[in-house]
Each structure stands twice: as C-alpha cells, then as structure tokens.
Amino acid sequence: MSYLREVATAVALLLPFILLNKFWRPNSKDSIVNDDDDSTSEVDAISDSTNPSGSFPSVEYEVFLSFRGPDTREQFTDFLYQSLRRYKIHTFRDDDELLKGKEIGPNLLRAIDQSKIYVPIISSGYADSKWCLMELAEIVRRQEEDPRRIILPIFYMVDPSDVRHQTGCYKKAFRKHANKFDGQTIQNWKDALKKVGDLKGWHIGKNDKQGAIADKVSADIWSHISKENLILETDELVGIDDHITAVLEKLSLDSENVTMVGLYGMGGIGKTTTAKAVYNKISSCFDCCCFIDNIRETQEKDGVVVLQKKLVSEILRIDSGSVGFNNDSGGRKTIKERVSRFKILVVLDDVDEKFKFEDMLGSPKDFISQSRFIITSRSMRVLGTLNENQCKLYEVGSMSKPRSLELFSKHAFKKNTPPSYYETLANDVVDTTAGLPLTLKVIGSLLFKQEIAVWEDTLEQLRRTLNLDEVYDRLKISYDALNPEAKEIFLDIACFFIGQNKEEPYYMWTDCNFYPASNIIFLIQRCMIQVGDDDEFKMHDQLRDMGREIVRREDVLPWKRSRIWSAEEGIDLLLNKKGSSKVKAISIPWGVKYEFKSECFLNLSELRYLHAREAMLTGDFNNLLPNLKWLELPFYKHGEDDPPLTNYTMKNLIIVILEHSHITADDWGGWRHMMKMAERLKVVRLASNYSLYGRRVRLSDCWRFPKSIEVLSMTAIEMDEVDIGELKKLKTLVLKFCPIQKISGGTFGMLKGLRELCLEFNWGTNLREVVADIGQLSSLKVLKTTGAKEVEINEFPLGLKELSTSSRIPNLSQLLDLEVLKVYDCKDGFDMPPASPSEDESSVWWKVSKLKSLQLEKTRINVNVVDDASSGGHLPRYLLPTSLTYLKIYQCTEPTWLPGIENLENLTSLEVNDIFQTLGGDLDGLQGLRSLEILRIRKVNGLARIKGLKDLLCSSTCKLRKFYITECPDLIELLPCELGGQTVVVPSMAELTIRDCPRLEVGPMIRSLPKFPMLKKLDLAVANITKEEDLDAIGSLEELVSLELELDDTSSGIERIVSSSKLQKLTTLVVKVPSLREIEGLEELKSLQDLYLEGCTSLGRLPLEKLKELDIGGCPDLTELVQTVVAVPSLRGLTIRDCPRLEVGPMIQSLPKFPMLNELTLSMVNITKEDELEVLGSLEELDSLELTLDDTCSSIERISFLSKLQKLTTLIVEVPSLREIEGLAELKSLRILYLEGCTSLERLWPDQQQLGSLKNLNVLDIQGCKSLSVDHLSALKTTLPPRARITWPDQPYR
C-alpha cells in the first residue's frame, strides 16, 4: 500500500509537467544595443546554444507584432508583415482599432499568451498610445514568467537610449499619461520600456531600406522557429557535448565540398538526439534545412516518394500536395533542379539496408557546394555502402560515467546528483546500464521514490544482464516492475494502438479492470509511452520492439502467444483452428475478404480484442468468445444468400465497430440479436458503405440498444424505429444519413450527459418532437442537424461551440462560445443580425465574438435594409462579425449582394457560389479583405463585375494566394485595366483559375500575369482570344509548374503556341485548342513531365524530346508523333486513346527505345496483328499496362509477351476477341489483374498448378469473362492466395 501511495503522490506532483512534455528553444544571444554608447545594429538572431526549453501549450501564433498604427502601419509594419507571410510565419498583427474599453480585451490577451516571439515596433508615437504601453507591459510580464518567449524589438527612427530612459518624445508622452493613470501603472509601463530598450534589436533610420530590413528580420525570425520540431528535453542533452563536437569536426563546415556524415550505434544510444542537437546548432548557417525522421518505417510503409515530397516541401516551403511529381524519378529530378541549388542541411534519421541515397536524392555531386547531409542508422554496414560518396562515419558510443550518473539522477531523484545516502547504489546501477540513455531514463524513472529494497532487487536483475549485447533485457526490467494491469496496457499499445486515439481503448481497459486513467499516467512517468497533442498514443521504437518481442518470447508458436498483429499469422490461426486460451488479441489489418466460420474461434476463450478487415463471420457462436470486449470488422459484408450468423451472445462486448459495411441478410445477419444480448456495450459504430454499394443497409422493426452505451454512431442505415428511452449515459449520438421512421422512448432533452449530437440529413415522422427540448442540454458542445428538415429548435443549448443546422436560430445572441456556424437549406432563411452603427453590445455579432467560420448554404438570407442618407439605402456596414476567418455563401437566394465584407479584415477564405441569380450587378468590398488568401467564385449568374479586386491586388499587403472564378456567364470584367506600374507586384499569388466565363474580357488579367511572379498553377478556359501574341505574357511566369489552356471556337486565330524558354519549372501542360496546328518549343521545357492534348483536332505534329509522361486523347487528326523513336528516352508514362488516324503500329515498334517506360495505356487504338504486341515484352521496367481494344481488333486472340515483364504489378486487359493469355503465372510481382470484358477468354493458365505462384496478387476481376470453364474457376478458389479479392463473372467471391 505504501508503494501505491507513493505512486499516487508521484502522479499528483508530475501530472502538470507530463502534460507539457514538449519544449521549444528560445534565442540566447545578448543584446546588440550597447548600454555604453546607446548605439544599435542589426541583430544576428541565431541560436548557437543547445540549451533546451519547452514548447508552449496551445500555441496559435509564431509572431506577435505590436505597433502604433499611424506611425508604421502603412510603411514598415506592412513590409514586415508581408515578408513574414512569405516565410509562412503565422503572425498576429494588432491594430489600434481592435482595442475597445479601458483594458486589453480577452482576444488580445489570448493572442499575446499564445505567441512565441514578440516584435514591438517602437516608434516616436508608441508611448502616446496607452494601448501600446498596455500591450508592451503584458508582453514583458509574459516573457518574465516564461523565458522561452523572445522579445525582438525594432527601434523605428528613434534612439534606443530615449526608449530606455523615457527621454525625448517619451518624456512628453508620460506627462500626459500621469494625469489619467495611477503611479503604479505608469511605473509598470516605464519598466517595460526600459527592459525592451535594453534588449538587442534592429534600428531603422531615415535612409535605411525598410523592405530589405523587413526581409532580414523575417529571415532571422525564421531561423528561430524553423527549429521548432527539433524538440530536445533537458535530459536528452546530458552527455552529448562530445558527440556534437566530433560530428561538427567531421562536417567540416569551412570546406567547400558537399559532405556526408553517418552516425551509427545501437538503438537508444542517442543517435537521433545527437543529430537534432547538431542540426539546432548549425541550421542557421544554411539557406534551407530539413530533418526527416523515421526513414526506415516511412519507406517501408509509404515508399521513397513520400520522403522525397517531404524533403521538397520542407526546403521550398510549399505544400507536399503541390510538389509536382508522383514517382521517384520525378522526385530526383525535382530535387536536382529545384533543391540542389540551395546550400542545404538535411538529416535523414534511422535508415536501414533498404535505403539508397541515390534512389531518394540522386547524386551528391548535384548539390551546391557546402551542403551537408547527416544520416543515422543502427548499422555501420548500411552507412558503409555510402563510402563511395565519401561518407564520414562516426560511432555514437555509450555515455561517460559522470554523464550517465547525471542523466540517471534526473529521473531517479529529479536532480543532477544523487543524495549521499543513495550515492553508492546509484553508481552501481549506472555501472550496469552500459551508458545507454534510454535505459538510464527508464530505469531511473522506475526507481523514483522507491525504497532501498526495491533498488537492491533492481540492481541484482541488472547485473544478470551484463553480458547481453542488446538493450531488450535491460529495458524489460522496467516492464517487469509494472503492475499486471499496466503490463497489459503497455503490450496492447505496442502491438495495436500506436498512433490511435486513446478514447476507445480506455473503454476496453476500464472494463478489464486495467485502470487506464492511473496506469497511463504511470507509463508516461516511467518514460514508456507518450500521448500526443491529439490524444494519440506514441512510443519509442525500441520500446515498441521490446513489447512485441516480449509477446514473441511467450512461445515459439504464434497461436500460443497473447497477441497476434501479423495478418498472415492471424489468418493461419483462424482458418486452421489453432486457437488457444492464451490468445488475448488478434488484428488482421489488411483485407482478406474471407469467411471465418464459428469453428474457427474454438478455444479462444480469453480473446478480448478482434480486428479483421473485410472478413465475414458465419455459423453458430453460442458459447464462443465469452470474454470478447472489442469487435471491429471494417468493410464487413453479409448478404441474403450468405450463411447466417446465429446465437451471437457475447455478453461482455464493450465496443462494436462495423464501418463501411454492407449487411443485407435477415435480422441483419444475426447482429441485431447480438446487440440485445451485449448488455455492457459502451461504443457502437455502424455504417454502411453507401458510396460503394449505392444503397443503405436497412434495420427492420424497433432497435433497442443496451442502456450502457455512451457512444452510438450510425451512418447511412435505414431504420424503422430506434428506442433511446434508456440511453441515459450517452455522450455522443450520431445518426447521419439515416432515414428513421420513429425515435421512441423519450426526447433528446433527457440525455443530460450528451456532448455531441449529429442528426445530419435525417428524416422521420417524429424527429421534430424529440428535439423540441434540446435547449436543456447544458453539456452539449457540438450539434449538427443540417439536412434534417423536420427538426425545429426553439432554443439552442448555450454552451455550443459548433452548430450546423437547417433550422432558425432564435437565440443566436446567447451562443457566446460559438466558433463554427453552418446553416444549410433552412426553409425559414437565416435572419442576418442587424448591427448597430456603433457596434456596441446590442449587436448580435458583437456578442458572438468567437465566431471563426460561417457557412450559409441553400438558404435565404433575411436582412433589413437601412434607408437613410448615411447608409445609401443599403445594409449596415458591420453586418458580419469581424472575427470571421472563413465565409462560404452557396446558393443563397437573398441578398443580391454581399454586405459588409469589406470589414472582414481577418477573413482568409471567401467562397461565393450561385447567389447572384437576380442581380445584374457587381461584387464589391474586396479591397478591405487584407487577410484574404483564398477567393472562390463559381456559378454566379448576373455577376457583371468584381469591384475592388484591382485595389486588393495593388495593395502592398495583398496576401491572395489562390483565386478561382468559374462558370460566371454574365461576367464582363475582372480588372478594368491591366495592373500597371513597376511597384505593383503580387508575390503571394500561387494559383489562378478562370474558366467558363464566355463574356469576360480576359485581356487585362492575362496581360497582368507578369505581376504574379510566384504563380505556380494557371488554368485558363476562356474565349475571345484572337491573337497568338495575347498569350505571350504566360511566358514570363518562371515559377509556373502547371499550365492548362482551353480555348473554344471563338479563338480560331490561335493556330500556333510558342513555349517560352523561361518556363523551366513547368512539369504539366494541358492543351485543349481546336484550332491549334503546332506547338513550338516543347524541347525547351526541360522539366516537362506530363503533356495532355485533348480536342486538338487540327494538331499535326509534336516535337517530344524531354518528356516524362505523354497522354494523348481525342485528337482525330493526329497522324504523327515526330522524333518519338530516338528523342524520348526519358519517357515513363505513355497513354494513347481515341486517335483513329494515328499510325500506332510504328509507335508500338519504337517502344524499346523508351527504356524507362513504366506505365503504358493503349485504349481504343487500331491494332490488327498479334505480332505487333510482341515488342511489349521488351519493356522490362513496365509497372502498369492497360490494353483496351474494341471489336475492330478481332484478330487479337492471344497474348504471349507477358513472361518477361517481371516488374509488372498492374495489368488491365479488355479485348473481346482474346481467347488465351500466356505467361501470367510468371508475373511474380503482379498485384492487380483486371480482365473485365474479355468475353472470349477460355483460360488464364495452361497449367492450373501454376496459379499458386502469384503470391502477391491482391485483386482479380474476371467479371464479363463468360467463357471461362467451371473447372478453371474452381481451381482459382483453391490455389490463389487467401488475400486475393476476386470478382467473378456473376458475383463476388468470399
């Protein structure tokens, strides 16, 4: 009991610190403002220390700008803010007009509290503003409370000495304040100014180039925050100074050569920590930096392309989804052309023998001099293969004895040294740990606050492991010291729940009496698990491997172990009925689409967790699986003709998850009976796969769930009746896309503990009655009733944070915590709250001050027009809350204009879709949206002009990144004229789409394209372009990656397109121009990978020299592909479809000239001879092949070239005349085989015994192959791997 009391005490003491277990590093430089001479210089804000510090809880902003608007808003502050945005640094910019009342508002306080770096711009009038002084005092206070925060002042045309001593203009300001504020307040303000004046910062004089200084400030700020993800705990830094010094020496930072350093050592020795510390120390010396962790796991799971995209996105500061390549060769090309030109630092953490530097990054010689690469691995042999690239090796060895003792003491005693009476024991323990940091931390945490006897027992166990080479047995000592319940939780996480949210496992563990609340904290204290920001479980890979090894060592036979996480072992256990009472948990993570009969579960009396994707259960389950707690069968399918599931009486079930399922059998395949019998259920998630099967699953009669349920979620399930009468414990109720005839047993108002209720797109006869008293639910935070037309709510719960509804909201002004509001298809419309001219507390929007997102869809907006001289007969100025960051208005019939949007200075995204149906007018107000980043306007009838767009684009603070305008038939003007003047540049614009606006005068916008120098994606489907030179402006877009150009018949003068040599980054080109005859200069586009030509009915020839992917379709007059035989050796993807005049025979015969081709599609082309296809057998790199022919190719009866395509993974053949396919059995890599529509096919393999050779086959579709014999089909069932999903000519195979 004393041990438990100590644990409880430790929990109470450590819980606040556990919850803040990530730390962030501040700058450590001294002030550059010299106290002696009062001079200043620009700061070199680069941390050269590895001293740790923590991360901030709930950080929202990276930078907080404090300034006096009249002094700097239109000058330096805008320069700086725009520069910070270009660096994608999330910045809070304060304005005087945001401040109201006598104190700093809660929103501003929250912004200060949730920022990491403060940048006060101290100007001559800064102290004149009480708001600025209040802000500065609060900033200083927060920084003093938390030294991790950084203050980087900017002295704007003022003397820092005046700031420090409050002389000059500041003395006058404080004289004025002295008459209005008490002495203590004045002193606090002076102290804040003095502290900031003492700090180093930037000094801006009259003749300084403010834009250049703003960029310098941004770059230095970025050097701070770019290290944020390299978090190092205090204890991680113990003992690594020698490692850092050694690695820095090998990196030879003064050398002009590209240098690689490989760190190797056993798991848990500190390789990653050393790499992070070196990264933190030197990253500021490089143009760009990137740290990629978990290489081994990521490459095995997702492939090298994911790693390449992460590298490119980190270095270029772009979204990984827009990097412009989808295969490893494209990644290497992008890295060579766009990344290698920077001086970069790249850390590749935890590589194994599968990693090849050249496969991911290309040759090190491609990178600019002084670039550096750090690679970590457990194996010296793996790094030894890099020696040809002059990789310098360094072994990260064990910690020294003094450092080991220090690290151990931090965990065992919460101090740097042991107490005198524990000193001998502590030294003895350290001697047994071999200087392994992970072991020292785990064992130290184990012994924290333990009695001497426990220390002595642990020491004896450690001494028994002295001769072991691996960390397993040392770490296992900490595992052995856990209580039995904590052991079960630890092994469950290691085997099944890493990366998963903790909520549902808690239910299972609670029912098993594992006490998860206390034991999870206990495991965190012991450094054995972590819980992430999203409540997901995390675990060091060494501890994960140890946990799984513990399970493996339980028995040499998998079916005699407690947990099975291998699909192969799980399938073998069930199909061969090898179950035993030792098995507690089984997971079959990937789909097997197989039937498991009840006898497969014999002897599994202790099984408590079963997860099997696409499996089906049949038979009599009476007295089977009595202890099952968790049953999860995603993509479960049970039809009317399938064997039934009977006597499913698992009374101890806690969690049932049947998502993406399709159950059509009577009594729902036995599941309804199970629901009745499972009296202890806590979580039920049922969802039919409506998108796949096109219809909902039906639950007949009245369904009653056990009264124990706390989470009930049903999606796309049709029900006669649901009884909620006894579900008093519900916390979450989701009934989405569920037609319900009746909800019985009471009303939702009686569910007092309900936190989330979703009734989206539901309808039923009494839905209105059961929601009538929902306003009583004080605990409800999320309510979604959109599409539920029968729902009418007179009063919404006051504590809501998120509301989606199709009902009127009579008490909107009382929803003070509301952050997200969506109104969809409300028949009564949405009553736009009137705003008072003074915007005082009588305004509804002023009260709902936390609202961030407003979506009005398919709803009439009810407004009152103010008819007076000041309003001009329009709506009040402040009609929408200024807190909004996202506004979407879709198919809202009124009003016929958007009032008040010019005031939405925080708005980042505006979507307008189909709302101007009755308007013959304009959209105005864009000029005021200074934070706007995304603008989408689609299908807006009656919209003639977009006013304010030019003013927005010409603003020096313009942040617009993406602009889409489509399907606006009445639009005649975007810009009244092209953007002129040398100073007008919109560097933020990255994507521009203009489509289907037939009356639009697009010329001014096209001629303005050079003003968008960073434009990466351009999509133009426009009319009325009559001159080829009108398109010349596109050629100036040097950053362009993707270009789509579609012109109609009104642009008949466009017969030739000349590709500019400046488009060196263009990877994708899509052209749809009927009048086009020729494209010149394609050979100049060195990065072009994908070329799509569709509807170019006049096109006659193509020069294709550097192409990676060619897709040609719908070009009936195309007859020739020039130079294809010798000029496209780099081609990787080729698609030809619907080109009847193209001589495809010569093209096919030239395919051997494309040695890198890995994807080939020939669809609806004219092939008349079988021997024309033989050449395909020479394409040894081919990964995917699709051959689709129609009845005109009736001579193709046999395919015999496949046996040489050993890398082929996907084969799609649709040839009606085909009778035989040779060589399929030799395709060892084949995973997907589609033969749909091969109506004459008689057999797949000459020898049925060869079927078993396709070990990797996952999908076989032979639907439509009506000529296959019964014997052939029977052989398929018995010889193909169990995982293979087969679609038969008439029905799916189980």
UniProtKB/Swiss-Prot annotation:
Domain TIR: 59-221
Function: TIR-NB-LRR receptor-like protein that confers resistance to the flax rust phytopathogenic fungus (M.lini). An NAD(+) hydrolase (NADase): in response to activation, catalyzes cleavage of NAD(+) into ADP-D-ribose (ADPR) and nicotinamide; NAD(+) cleavage triggering a defense system that promotes cell death. Also able to hydrolyze NADP(+), but not other NAD(+)-related molecules. Makes small amounts of 2' cyclic ADPR (2'cADPR).
One Gene Ontology MF term: NAD+ nucleosidase activity
Annotated effect of mutating residue 130 to A: Reduced ability to promote cell death without affecting homooligomerization
Name this polypeptide is given: Disease resistance protein L6
NAD recorded as keyword: yes
Ranges for region Disordered: 34-54
Signal peptide: 1-29
Family annotation (PANTHER family): DISEASE RESISTANCE PROTEIN (TIR-NBS CLASS)-RELATED (PTHR11017:SF570), LEUCINE-RICH REPEAT-CONTAINING PROTEIN (PTHR11017)
Keywords from the UniProt entry: Hydrolase, Leucine-rich repeat, NAD, Plant defense, Repeat, Signal
Listed EC numbers: 3.2.2.-, 3.2.2.6
LRR repeat intervals: 246-268, 468-492, 604-625, 626-650, 904-928, 1012-1039, 1063-1085, 1086-1109, 1179-1203, 1205-1229, 1254-1278
